[in-house]
Amino acid sequence: MANQLRERHQSLKKKYGELIDGDPSVPPEKRKQVNLAQLLGDSREKCKKMESEIKELQQRLGEVQGDNKLLRMTIAKQRLGDDEVGKRHFAPHEREDLVLQLEKAKEQIEAFEHDLQASLDELQDVKQERSFFQDKAERLNQELNHVLGGHEKRIIDIDALCMENRYLQERLKQVQEEVNLQKSNLVKYKNALEKRRNSKSNTKLSSSALTGVLSAKQVQELLSEEHGCSLPATPQSVSDLKSLATALLETIHEKNMVIQHQRQTNKILGNRVAELEKKLRTLEVSGLWSLPGGRDTITLSNPSSPSRGPKSLIPAFTDVPHHKPLTNEEHGQPGVELGSPALDEGSDNEAAKQLANSQVPLGNTYDNTYLHPFIPLLCQENEDLERQGPEIAKMTQELTAGEIEETSFEIPPDSQSTASSQENHDNLQSPFSSPEPSGAMSKKHPDISLGDENIVPVPQECADEITAGSNVNQCTEAQHDNKDCWEIEDCDSSEKAANNSCELIERCNRLNESVS
């Protein structure tokens, strides 16, 4: 048995020796290369066979899956007895997923419905609150109108009053600053007057060094070319020059204060004009007024006629029909002063009598003709101003002549600088020289802009003209009462005041013509 196995082994070794060890005729070094080439070829053939087998298996897998699907559909048809089940049939696990998705969708729908109901409830509450505040605003407007003595059917705009209140507060601050400045000037005048009374001589130049007060003639003599180089180098002349320099420095300081006040005034007026432009723009957008004609004319929309513009969002109580304007006698109220309380008694009484006896509609009450309660019309006080204009110009010219005649009075340098700045300040800041009586002019008649570019507050312009006349009369009373205060006699400033008054009168006339 062992011999047979040995023989078998030898025979197989001889038979497969060439495959294991390679060709015996090839050198041993090349046998390995031959074996590697054969192995590579064999592996490639095996890969090809395996790829073909994989393709066959994939094809069979697709066929089996199709058969499986067809079999499932056949089973479902047999169970349901419906030949058109087809696409409507789902597997059990797919059906469970669909049921879960449906339940989640129902929960989301319920949550959305709950949120929608809450939003609707909140919207209803907001609407009720809005209606409540609208009613409250209407009641407040009516009560305010009743307190201010206005018409029952013409409601006052609270927003306009708030805007006017801010404007008047700024004006009040400006007036308070001016009052403080005038008080300081008055203290300065009193000190100069006391020094002047305590001095022994009032006409000699030597007294100026002791009192620190120089007259206009003495200033001209000191600064003249003939005597400028011949001043003796004495302590008296040095003190005179020092007092003169101090007076000029105070004058410059007061001029700077006047310029600063004027800038603040211009800023306040600019803010006022901007607010009025914004309000008029909103009214124009809401269709309450328009500018179809020229640039200097205003056409207000008539609420009785149908408007072609956008519908107004203002409540219905604003639509008020036209009515006849009332006079002082029909209204039952005393005549309203248009000017400052500081006017002369004669002119003041005459103006009051004219207003009391006239049949012209009141300018400072709410009984004038209004096309809409939110748009106060231009008051008809321009006619009164036209009648009073020549009187104001005449008084201004008389004041100028009186000032020219009184140039011989001696004045302190402080009074010279302060009075000149005061007169220029009155000319520049006439709107704030005297407050309007009880704020009726500004509160009840907001400024109306004319045109697109030239925006001129007409009622304020008229008030400025009257207050300019009041300042002139104040100066006249001060000269008659206290001639020892040494008021400044500045002819140029007086002429400017007269010219400004005439220009204001002409401007009011032109504005009245354009509006009419």
UniProtKB/Swiss-Prot annotation:
Domain of life: Eukaryota
Keyword annotations from UniProtKB, A to Z: Coiled coil
Biased composition (Basic and acidic residues): 1-18, 321-332
The keyword DNA-binding is annotated on this UniProt entry: no
Polar residues bias spans: 414-436
Annotated coiled-coil segments of the chain: 1-195, 259-286
Record has DNA-binding as a keyword: no
Region (Disordered): 1-29, 321-350, 406-452
Similarity annotation: Belongs to the CCDC149 family.
Protein's UniProt name: Coiled-coil domain-containing protein 149
